[in-house]
Amino acid sequence: MKILIFIIASFMLIGVECKEGYPMGRNGCKIPCAINDNICKVECQAKWKQSDGYCYSWGLSCYCTNLLEDAEVWDSSNNKCVG
């Protein structure tokens, strides 16, 4: 029985995914970048210590990975960008 519980728990852990998204600046807009991953990595880690970041070339904006579920990221449905 313990083995069965262990196997089920293992499958649940394998499927765990972290939140991802665009970090927002003070004005509510995405943080712009131009092919420089270091800037984005610094921005993401300044807001969320455990995160990683890179410059998403298609959108020319920083993109953060490994975020906590309650992390506030830019969302097109409730865009508050004023810049």
Curated annotation (Swiss-Prot):
Record-linked Pfam families: Toxin_3
Name where it mostly resides. secreted
Write out the GO MF terms: sodium channel inhibitor activity; toxin activity
Q: Which UniProt keywords apply?
A: Disulfide bond, Ion channel impairing toxin, Neurotoxin, Secreted, Signal, Toxin, Voltage-gated sodium channel impairing toxin
The lineage's top-level taxon is Eukaryota
SS bond list: C29-C81, C33-C55, C40-C62, C44-C64
The subcellular localization recorded is: Secreted
Every LCN-type CS-alpha/beta domain range: 19-82
| Keyword match Signal | yes
**GO cellular component terms given for this protein:** extracellular region
Does the record's keyword annotation contain Transcription? no
* Expression sites (tissue/organ): Expressed by the venom gland.
- Signal peptide bounds: 1-18
Q: Which family does it belong to?
A: Belongs to the long (4 C-C) scorpion toxin superfamily. Sodium channel inhibitor family. Beta subfamily.
What UniProt notes about the protein's domains is:
Has the structural arrangement of an alpha-helix connected to antiparallel beta-sheets by disulfide bonds (CS-alpha/beta).
**Known function:** Beta toxins bind voltage-independently at site-4 of sodium channels (Nav) and shift the voltage of activation toward more negative potentials thereby affecting sodium channel activation and promoting spontaneous and repetitive firing.
Q: What is this protein called?
A: Putative beta-neurotoxin RjAa15f
